[in-house]
Structures are given as C-alpha cells and as structure tokens.
C-alpha cells in the first residue's frame, strides 16, 4: 500500500511540474513575434536608429578622454589592425549585417505588416503607400549611409547586401562606379518611399528631405576634384 501511495505522489509531483519551466522569457521578445505587426517591425527598425551613433564611437568632447592609440594618426602610422581603423570597419559592417537581416524579414512579412499598419500605437503618421516599403526605405537609407562612410575612408569596399552566414564568402571590393550606382539606387528608393516630414516621437526618422540632402552630399563627393577630376569642371559649370 505504501508503495502504491508513493508512486501516486511521485506521479502527481511530476504532472504538477509539467509546463512550469516552459515559460516565455520576461526580459526579451521571442523571435516569432518580431514581425507579426507593424509596431513589432518598427521596433526592429528602431534598433538601427539606436545603433547609428555607435558605429564611430560617438562624439568625445571631454578633456577626460585619452586615447594613446590615436597618436599614430599624426605620423600616419596606422595599420589595418590599429584600433580606430579596425573599429570603424568592423562596426560599420556589423551595422550593415543588421540592416540586411531587417530588410529580409520586412520583405518576408510584408503582407501582415501592411495589414495592421493603420492600427499602430507607435506611429500616427498618415501612410498612403505600403508601410513596409516605407520602413524599408528608412533602412536602405541607413545602410547606404554606412556604406558611404566606409567609402569615404577606404574607397571601394565589399558590397554585401544580403544576410550572410557566420563565415561569409569572399567578396571583392566594389569599384567606384559600382559603389555610387548602389548608393544612388538606395537613395532613389528611399526618396520614393520615405515620408515628407516627421513629428512627435517620430521626429528624427528619415524623411525625403534627409534623403535629398544626403544624396546631394554623395553627388558632390562623387564629383570632387580628388575623386573624379574629369567631372570637376562640370560641377562648377
């Protein structure tokens, strides 16, 4: 009898524990909910905005900042492993990889995102076209800005525009023509999809004016005497 009672108690204890440890984490969102609504998609895009200030170590204006490694910049004694050079490269490509993944997920979940964009609790702007394409325009602008920054430092760099695995295949450096064709295509898409203006909590997000301003900067750089001497006279004319 005691053995039967013990077996019953043990089975009850095991049954009562079932599902107890299968709870969703309270400090992070499960991946399956990342793009199930417009607001969920917007939160992912917001990550890019939040990280935009970290790709170049921010602005260090206090005299308390001391970076002995930067002393190599004066005599131009920098190498590919110097901290400032390595960080600039790796941080921008980490940012680009994040943008590539977000773009892929936005495209995959476009239908469900567009369906409930009108019920957003985070974005009260009037969106006349596809809400997903608007978000993609913002992301493509931010990714293009990262590539433009890399080009200004290094010239042509590998153009990686799709998510890659842990060990991506070797990608050769893009030519100047390839770089600017990519940048202009990205700006054209963003100019078409982004909104005219933003206000309230959305103030600071990419607008058509921001895209036009950045596009002008890219074209001036493209036509500069240092980078494209044959176009310099045309720019002045």
Describe the role of every protein-language-model region:
Residues 19, 56-59, 150-159:
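Proline-centered turn/helix-capping motifs that create local helix->coil transitions or kinks
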Residues 1-26:
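Bacterial Sec-dependent N-terminal signal peptides
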Residues 140, 212-215:
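TPR/Sel1-like alpha-solenoid repeat signature
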Residues 17-61:
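Membrane-proximal, proline-rich intrinsically disordered regions
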Residues 157, 161-164, 170-173, 213, ...:
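Acidic, serine/threonine/proline-rich low-complexity intrinsically disordered regions
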Residues 151-152, 158, 198, 221-230:
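Short coil/turn linking the two alpha-helices of tandem helical-hairpin repeats
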Residues 30, 37-42, 46, 53, ...:
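Conserved, well-structured interaction surfaces
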């Amino acid at each position: 009898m005691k053995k039967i009672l013990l077996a019953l108690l043990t089975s009850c204890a095991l049954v009562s524990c079932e599902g107890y440890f299968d709870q969703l984490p309270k400090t992070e969102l499960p991946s399956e909910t990342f793009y199930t609504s417009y607001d969920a998609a917007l939160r992912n895009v917001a990550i890019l905005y939040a990280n935009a200030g970290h790709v170049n170590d921010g602005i260090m204006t206090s005299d308390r900042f001391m970076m002995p490694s930067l002393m190599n910049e004066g005599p131009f004694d920098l190498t590919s492993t110097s901290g400032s050079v390595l960080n600039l490269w790796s941080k921008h490509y980490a940012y680009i990889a994040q943008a590539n993944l977000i773009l892929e997920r936005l495209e995959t979940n476009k239908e469900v995102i567009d369906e409930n964009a009108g019920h957003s609790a985070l974005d009260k702007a009037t969106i006349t076209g596809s809400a997903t394409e608007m978000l993609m325009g913002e992301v493509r602008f931010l990714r293009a800005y990262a590539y433009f920054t890399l080009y200004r430092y290094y010239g042509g760099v590998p153009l990686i525009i799709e998510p890659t695995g842990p060990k991506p295949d070797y990608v050769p450096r893009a030519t100047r023509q390839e770089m600017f064709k990519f940048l202009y295509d990205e700006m054209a898409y963003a100019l078409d999809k982004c909104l005219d203006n933003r206000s309230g909590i959305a103030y600071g997000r990419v607008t058509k004016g921001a895209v036009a301003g950045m596009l002008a900067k890219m074209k001036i750089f493209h036509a500069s005497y240092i980078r494209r001497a044959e176009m310099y006279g045309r720019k002045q004319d």
